[in-house]
């Protein structure tokens, strides 16, 4: 990605405005998203923008949609979202975009109603690497389990899809013991 033309100073002072930016996570109160909250807070401190993070207390697509509805009603400038279910958030994110709210998504490569989609890495390549390490550790033989945070988690399912495809090609002596399991995020 060529970022040479990307704006470097994104502070409220440089923009001449303080933007309100909400991050909506899959579920509040778990370590992964607690760490994300630290980054959201740091971004606010670094730039002067009004930023915060919210999420449902349990992994619940309807509760996440309601949080986004509330943010639309508040008139935020941007919503950053890690969807629990891409299908569930599509309509409400379209509504946000129709109202001029910028939508930025993470862990949702197939989301249609986003202005930007950011992922940390290539999901298939990540799955390939997971299986490469597992396959070598198992000597290329035996049964294994595949788990995801939730069965609706797009990125994690892409990891597992990549891993299974890699296993079939490189470790035919291995088999998936059961369908992938969801851990409830």
Task: Name every feature range the model reports, one short phrase each.
Residues 1-185:
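A residue-level marker of the well-folded mature domains of exported/periplasmic proteins
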